[in-house]
Amino acid sequence: DHNTAKTVIDSITKLYEGLGHDDFCKLFPVILTDNGSEFSHPSALEFAPDGRRRTQIFYCDPMASYQKPQVERNHEFIRTVLPKGTSFDSLSQMDIDLMMAHVNSYGRPALGDKSPFEMFAFLYGKKLLDKLLRLTCQRVIPANEIILKPALLRR
């Protein structure tokens, strides 16, 4: 699927409903994004279908990737699996989920050599991590099984 305003709203709503109001608001008090057309309906993202505020949307300045450095670091990891020039068109959602599980299981110096998943569990608890993993079809990859190379998605 292509990212449209509707698919982004649907994804946020799925997370909101799966996490519940309190956990969603704890995890996503603010969403910082770019000015892409998929984020062109901020009120539909900020407010739940029942009208309750669930987050606040803020936009980065154009050409200011430094405003979201951790996202840019994830893009670098994605490019180790899918080098520049590689089409994303043939990727299934399962491929993307697998790749992101490997990316988010990888320890990083900026996180004290912990992975994003480990830091999440430290900050919010394993129970909430497990809930989020189920909702996003993710899983923690053991460190000795992480593959951040094109071979990860070769069939």
Which ranges hold each PLM region?
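Active-site beta-loop-alpha junctions of metal-dependent nucleic acid enzymes
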Residues: 1-22
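Short helix-terminating capping/connector loops at secondary-structure junctions
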Residues: 22-27, 52-54
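Conserved, well-structured core segments that form or line functional sites
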Residues: 4, 24, 30-31, 35, ...
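RNase H-like two-metal-ion nuclease catalytic core shared by retroviral integrases
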Residues: 33-35, 42-48, 57-81, 89-101
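Glycine-rich, phosphate-binding/catalytic loops in enzymes
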Residues: 48-50, 121
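Short strand->helix junction
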Residues: 2-5, 64, 85
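C-terminal domain-tail junction helix/linker
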Residues: 84-155
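Short basic/hydrophobic patches in alpha-helices and adjacent helix-turn junctions
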Residues: 14-17, 77-84, 101-105
